[in-house]
Amino acid sequence: MNCLYVFNPENDMALADGKASYTPPARIRQMRQELWWLPEWWADEGDIVWNGEDKLNLPDETRILPWGWSTALCRQLRQAGVQESLLPSAEKLEHIRQLSHRQTAVALLQELREQLPLDGHFCGESTLCRSEEEVRDAVGRYGEAMLKQPWSSSGRGIRKIQAKTLSNSLVKGASSKEQGEVSLIVEKFLHKVSDFALEFWLDGKGGVEYRGLSLFYTNERGAYLGNWVAPEGQKLAWLAQYVPLSYLQEIRRWWEQRLRSFDYEGPVGIDMMLAEEGICPCIEVNWRWTMGLVACLLAEQGRYGRMVVEYIYGHYAAEVEAFG
Protein backbone atom coordinates (compact mmCIF):
# COMPACT_ATOMS: atom_id res chain seq x y z
CA MET A 1 0.00 0.00 0.00
CA ASN A 2 1.44 3.35 -1.04
CA CYS A 3 1.19 6.42 1.18
CA LEU A 4 0.45 10.08 0.64
CA TYR A 5 2.46 12.26 3.03
CA VAL A 6 1.52 15.83 3.88
CA PHE A 7 3.63 18.23 5.96
CA ASN A 8 1.07 20.59 7.50
CA PRO A 9 2.87 22.27 10.45
CA GLU A 10 -0.14 24.49 11.14
CA ASN A 11 -2.03 21.48 12.49
CA ASP A 12 -2.21 22.53 16.15
CA MET A 13 -3.49 26.00 15.23
CA ALA A 14 -6.03 24.45 12.87
CA LEU A 15 -7.28 22.28 15.75
CA ALA A 16 -7.57 25.35 17.98
CA ASP A 17 -9.61 27.16 15.34
CA GLY A 18 -11.73 24.11 14.60
CA LYS A 19 -13.11 25.36 11.29
CA ALA A 20 -12.57 23.85 7.83
CA SER A 21 -11.91 27.35 6.44
CA TYR A 22 -8.97 28.02 8.79
CA THR A 23 -6.09 30.05 7.31
CA PRO A 24 -2.78 29.98 9.26
CA PRO A 25 -0.53 33.02 9.78
CA ALA A 26 1.72 34.01 6.88
CA ARG A 27 4.90 32.71 8.56
CA ILE A 28 3.39 29.24 9.06
CA ARG A 29 2.09 29.20 5.48
CA GLN A 30 5.62 29.99 4.38
CA MET A 31 7.02 27.11 6.45
CA ARG A 32 4.62 24.68 4.79
CA GLN A 33 5.37 26.03 1.31
CA GLU A 34 9.13 25.82 1.79
CA LEU A 35 9.32 22.54 3.73
CA TRP A 36 6.52 20.55 2.06
CA TRP A 37 9.18 18.08 0.86
CA LEU A 38 10.25 17.09 4.40
CA PRO A 39 8.56 13.64 4.29
CA GLU A 40 10.87 12.72 1.40
CA TRP A 41 13.38 11.97 4.15
CA TRP A 42 11.42 8.87 5.17
CA ALA A 43 8.97 8.17 2.32
CA ASP A 44 9.36 4.85 0.48
CA GLU A 45 9.57 4.36 -3.26
CA GLY A 46 6.12 4.79 -4.76
CA ASP A 47 4.89 7.09 -1.99
CA ILE A 48 3.69 10.60 -2.78
CA VAL A 49 4.72 13.74 -0.90
CA TRP A 50 2.11 16.42 -1.57
CA ASN A 51 3.18 20.01 -2.15
CA GLY A 52 -0.24 21.32 -1.14
CA GLU A 53 -1.07 22.56 -4.63
CA ASP A 54 -1.14 19.71 -7.15
CA LYS A 55 -4.37 17.91 -7.96
CA LEU A 56 -4.42 14.35 -6.65
CA ASN A 57 -5.75 11.18 -8.26
CA LEU A 58 -5.19 8.51 -5.62
CA PRO A 59 -5.85 4.77 -5.78
CA ASP A 60 -8.59 3.64 -3.39
CA GLU A 61 -6.08 1.75 -1.21
CA THR A 62 -3.82 4.79 -0.61
CA ARG A 63 -2.97 5.52 3.01
CA ILE A 64 -2.89 9.24 3.84
CA LEU A 65 -0.35 10.20 6.51
CA PRO A 66 -0.41 13.94 7.24
CA TRP A 67 1.61 15.64 9.96
CA GLY A 68 -1.71 15.90 11.75
CA TRP A 69 -5.42 15.61 10.99
CA SER A 70 -7.86 18.53 11.08
CA THR A 71 -11.06 19.56 9.33
CA ALA A 72 -9.04 22.24 7.53
CA LEU A 73 -6.66 19.67 6.02
CA CYS A 74 -9.56 17.44 4.95
CA ARG A 75 -11.07 20.39 3.10
CA GLN A 76 -7.76 21.00 1.30
CA LEU A 77 -7.50 17.34 0.31
CA ARG A 78 -11.09 17.28 -0.99
CA GLN A 79 -10.38 20.37 -3.07
CA ALA A 80 -7.32 18.57 -4.49
CA GLY A 81 -9.53 15.69 -5.61
CA VAL A 82 -9.13 13.16 -2.81
CA GLN A 83 -12.10 10.83 -2.46
CA GLU A 84 -14.12 10.89 0.77
CA SER A 85 -13.42 7.20 1.44
CA LEU A 86 -9.76 8.00 2.14
CA LEU A 87 -10.53 10.70 4.73
CA PRO A 88 -11.48 10.33 8.41
CA SER A 89 -15.09 10.97 9.38
CA ALA A 90 -16.21 14.17 11.09
CA GLU A 91 -16.63 12.17 14.31
CA LYS A 92 -13.09 10.83 14.13
CA LEU A 93 -11.70 14.29 13.44
CA GLU A 94 -13.48 15.70 16.50
CA HIS A 95 -12.19 12.77 18.56
CA ILE A 96 -8.61 13.59 17.53
CA ARG A 97 -9.23 17.27 18.30
CA GLN A 98 -10.42 16.48 21.82
CA LEU A 99 -7.53 14.07 22.43
CA SER A 100 -5.16 16.86 21.37
CA HIS A 101 -6.60 19.29 23.94
CA ARG A 102 -4.09 19.81 26.74
CA GLN A 103 -6.67 18.52 29.22
CA THR A 104 -5.55 15.03 28.10
CA ALA A 105 -1.98 15.70 29.21
CA VAL A 106 -3.20 17.23 32.50
CA ALA A 107 -5.20 14.10 33.34
CA LEU A 108 -2.48 11.65 32.25
CA LEU A 109 0.23 13.42 34.26
CA GLN A 110 -1.87 13.17 37.41
CA GLU A 111 -2.71 9.53 36.69
CA LEU A 112 0.90 8.58 36.04
CA ARG A 113 2.18 10.27 39.18
CA GLU A 114 -0.43 8.49 41.29
CA GLN A 115 0.28 5.06 39.81
CA LEU A 116 4.06 5.29 39.42
CA PRO A 117 5.55 7.36 42.26
CA LEU A 118 9.23 6.41 41.57
CA ASP A 119 10.41 7.19 45.09
CA GLY A 120 9.46 10.85 44.82
CA HIS A 121 11.65 11.56 41.77
CA PHE A 122 8.72 12.84 39.71
CA CYS A 123 7.79 16.50 39.44
CA GLY A 124 5.28 18.54 37.51
CA GLU A 125 1.76 19.75 38.24
CA SER A 126 -0.84 21.24 35.94
CA THR A 127 -4.45 22.36 36.21
CA LEU A 128 -7.19 22.83 33.63
CA CYS A 129 -8.92 26.10 34.50
CA ARG A 130 -12.43 26.99 33.35
CA SER A 131 -12.71 30.45 34.91
CA GLU A 132 -10.49 33.43 35.64
CA GLU A 133 -10.84 32.70 39.36
CA GLU A 134 -9.52 29.16 38.85
CA VAL A 135 -6.56 30.57 36.91
CA ARG A 136 -5.70 32.95 39.74
CA ASP A 137 -6.05 30.18 42.34
CA ALA A 138 -3.76 27.82 40.40
CA VAL A 139 -1.09 30.46 39.79
CA GLY A 140 -1.29 31.39 43.47
CA ARG A 141 -0.65 27.77 44.49
CA TYR A 142 2.30 27.38 42.14
CA GLY A 143 3.83 30.82 42.68
CA GLU A 144 5.52 30.71 39.30
CA ALA A 145 3.70 29.09 36.40
CA MET A 146 3.31 28.62 32.67
CA LEU A 147 -0.01 29.60 31.10
CA LYS A 148 -0.83 27.41 28.11
CA GLN A 149 -3.70 27.57 25.66
CA PRO A 150 -5.56 24.28 25.03
CA TRP A 151 -4.18 23.69 21.54
CA SER A 152 -0.71 25.09 20.94
CA SER A 153 2.84 23.94 20.34
CA SER A 154 6.46 24.96 19.77
CA GLY A 155 6.28 27.95 22.09
CA ARG A 156 3.07 29.45 20.66
CA GLY A 157 0.22 30.12 23.07
CA ILE A 158 2.53 29.74 26.09
CA ARG A 159 3.39 32.39 28.68
CA LYS A 160 5.43 32.43 31.89
CA ILE A 161 3.88 34.26 34.83
CA GLN A 162 4.40 34.88 38.54
CA ALA A 163 1.58 35.15 41.05
CA LYS A 164 2.60 38.67 42.04
CA THR A 165 2.35 39.95 38.45
CA LEU A 166 -0.88 38.18 37.45
CA SER A 167 -3.57 40.60 36.31
CA ASN A 168 -7.11 40.25 35.01
CA SER A 169 -6.09 41.61 31.61
CA LEU A 170 -3.28 39.07 31.34
CA VAL A 171 -5.64 36.19 32.14
CA LYS A 172 -8.15 37.44 29.57
CA GLY A 173 -5.43 37.83 26.94
CA ALA A 174 -3.92 34.40 27.52
CA SER A 175 -7.19 32.48 27.71
CA SER A 176 -9.07 30.89 24.86
CA LYS A 177 -12.83 30.55 24.86
CA GLU A 178 -14.60 27.22 24.53
CA GLN A 179 -18.38 27.41 24.32
CA GLY A 180 -18.27 30.82 25.97
CA GLU A 181 -16.09 29.92 28.95
CA VAL A 182 -12.41 30.34 29.77
CA SER A 183 -10.11 27.44 28.94
CA LEU A 184 -6.51 27.68 30.08
CA ILE A 185 -3.92 25.27 31.44
CA VAL A 186 -1.78 26.46 34.33
CA GLU A 187 1.41 24.46 34.74
CA LYS A 188 3.83 24.73 37.64
CA PHE A 189 7.10 26.24 36.42
CA LEU A 190 10.08 23.87 36.38
CA HIS A 191 13.77 24.69 36.10
CA LYS A 192 14.67 22.77 32.97
CA VAL A 193 17.81 20.71 32.48
CA SER A 194 16.79 19.02 29.23
CA ASP A 195 13.80 18.22 27.02
CA PHE A 196 13.14 14.67 25.88
CA ALA A 197 10.27 12.61 24.52
CA LEU A 198 9.14 9.05 23.89
CA GLU A 199 7.76 8.32 20.43
CA PHE A 200 5.09 5.66 19.80
CA TRP A 201 2.86 4.39 17.00
CA LEU A 202 -0.65 3.09 17.73
CA ASP A 203 -2.38 0.69 15.33
CA GLY A 204 -5.92 1.55 16.45
CA LYS A 205 -6.52 -1.99 17.70
CA GLY A 206 -4.72 -1.84 21.05
CA GLY A 207 -1.24 -2.32 19.63
CA VAL A 208 1.49 0.11 20.69
CA GLU A 209 4.91 0.21 19.04
CA TYR A 210 7.76 2.10 20.68
CA ARG A 211 9.65 4.05 17.98
CA GLY A 212 12.40 5.63 20.01
CA LEU A 213 13.71 8.26 22.37
CA SER A 214 13.82 11.89 21.25
CA LEU A 215 16.35 14.36 22.63
CA PHE A 216 15.37 17.82 21.42
CA TYR A 217 16.07 21.41 22.32
CA THR A 218 14.09 24.63 22.29
CA ASN A 219 14.73 28.32 22.80
CA GLU A 220 13.76 30.24 25.93
CA ARG A 221 10.19 30.66 24.62
CA GLY A 222 9.79 26.93 24.02
CA ALA A 223 10.04 27.12 20.21
CA TYR A 224 11.56 24.02 18.62
CA LEU A 225 15.17 24.31 17.42
CA GLY A 226 16.37 20.79 16.67
CA ASN A 227 16.93 17.14 17.56
CA TRP A 228 19.84 14.86 18.26
CA VAL A 229 19.84 12.08 15.64
CA ALA A 230 21.77 9.19 17.16
CA PRO A 231 21.52 5.49 18.05
CA GLU A 232 19.12 4.73 20.89
CA GLY A 233 21.96 3.55 23.12
CA GLN A 234 23.81 6.85 22.85
CA LYS A 235 20.71 8.84 23.73
CA LEU A 236 20.01 6.63 26.74
CA ALA A 237 23.62 6.94 27.87
CA TRP A 238 23.33 10.71 27.82
CA LEU A 239 20.12 10.69 29.89
CA ALA A 240 21.69 8.20 32.31
CA GLN A 241 23.95 11.02 33.50
CA TYR A 242 20.89 12.59 35.11
CA VAL A 243 18.37 9.83 35.80
CA PRO A 244 18.57 6.05 36.42
CA LEU A 245 17.69 4.13 33.26
CA SER A 246 15.41 1.92 35.33
CA TYR A 247 13.16 4.96 35.87
CA LEU A 248 12.99 5.60 32.12
CA GLN A 249 12.13 1.95 31.51
CA GLU A 250 9.29 2.13 34.04
CA ILE A 251 7.97 5.32 32.46
CA ARG A 252 8.08 3.75 29.01
CA ARG A 253 6.27 0.61 30.19
CA TRP A 254 3.57 2.72 31.83
CA TRP A 255 2.95 4.65 28.62
CA GLU A 256 2.97 1.53 26.45
CA GLN A 257 0.26 0.03 28.64
CA ARG A 258 -1.79 3.21 29.02
CA LEU A 259 -1.82 4.07 25.32
CA ARG A 260 -3.43 0.73 24.49
CA SER A 261 -6.76 2.02 25.78
CA PHE A 262 -7.05 4.91 23.30
CA ASP A 263 -9.18 4.65 20.18
CA TYR A 264 -6.60 6.17 17.86
CA GLU A 265 -4.38 5.11 14.97
CA GLY A 266 -1.16 6.95 14.23
CA PRO A 267 1.85 8.55 15.91
CA VAL A 268 1.93 9.77 19.51
CA GLY A 269 4.81 11.76 21.00
CA ILE A 270 5.02 12.25 24.77
CA ASP A 271 7.09 15.34 25.62
CA MET A 272 8.84 15.15 28.99
CA MET A 273 11.40 17.14 30.94
CA LEU A 274 14.44 16.61 33.09
CA ALA A 275 14.31 19.42 35.63
CA GLU A 276 16.22 20.43 38.73
CA GLU A 277 13.11 19.36 40.64
CA GLY A 278 13.05 15.85 39.11
CA ILE A 279 11.48 14.12 36.09
CA CYS A 280 8.25 15.43 34.58
CA PRO A 281 6.89 12.44 32.62
CA CYS A 282 4.21 14.34 30.70
CA ILE A 283 4.57 17.92 29.49
CA GLU A 284 2.56 17.41 26.31
CA VAL A 285 0.91 14.57 24.40
CA ASN A 286 1.18 15.08 20.64
CA TRP A 287 -1.40 13.06 18.69
CA ARG A 288 0.42 13.70 15.43
CA TRP A 289 3.86 13.45 13.86
CA THR A 290 6.69 15.22 15.66
CA MET A 291 10.24 16.19 14.77
CA GLY A 292 11.28 13.66 17.41
CA LEU A 293 9.68 10.85 15.41
CA VAL A 294 11.42 12.16 12.28
CA ALA A 295 14.74 12.06 14.15
CA CYS A 296 14.08 8.45 15.18
CA LEU A 297 13.33 7.48 11.56
CA LEU A 298 16.52 9.19 10.37
CA ALA A 299 18.51 7.35 13.04
CA GLU A 300 17.12 4.06 11.71
CA GLN A 301 18.60 5.07 8.33
CA GLY A 302 21.99 5.75 9.95
CA ARG A 303 21.82 9.49 9.24
CA TYR A 304 23.35 10.66 12.50
CA GLY A 305 23.92 14.26 13.47
CA ARG A 306 22.02 17.34 14.55
CA MET A 307 18.67 17.85 12.85
CA VAL A 308 17.74 21.51 12.62
CA VAL A 309 14.72 23.38 11.34
CA GLU A 310 15.50 27.07 11.18
CA TYR A 311 14.38 30.38 9.74
CA ILE A 312 17.34 32.18 8.20
CA TYR A 313 17.56 35.08 5.75
CA GLY A 314 13.79 35.11 5.40
CA HIS A 315 13.39 31.43 4.53
CA TYR A 316 12.90 28.07 6.24
CA ALA A 317 15.49 25.31 5.98
CA ALA A 318 15.82 21.81 7.39
CA GLU A 319 18.91 19.63 7.39
CA VAL A 320 20.87 17.06 9.36
CA GLU A 321 24.27 18.50 10.28
CA ALA A 322 27.05 15.99 10.89
CA PHE A 323 28.45 15.96 14.42
CA GLY A 324 31.59 18.07 14.64
What positions do the PLM features span?
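Glycine-rich phosphate-binding loop of ATP-grasp-fold ATP-dependent ligases
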Residues: E125-L128, E144-L170, F196-A197, E220-W238
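C-terminal active-site "lid" helix and adjoining low-complexity regulatory extension at the edge
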Residues: Q241-S246, I279, W287-G324
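N-terminal-proximal low-complexity accessory segments that begin disordered
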Residues: M1-E40
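A long amphipathic alpha-helix within ATP-dependent nucleotide-binding catalytic cores
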Residues: G222-E277, Y316-G324
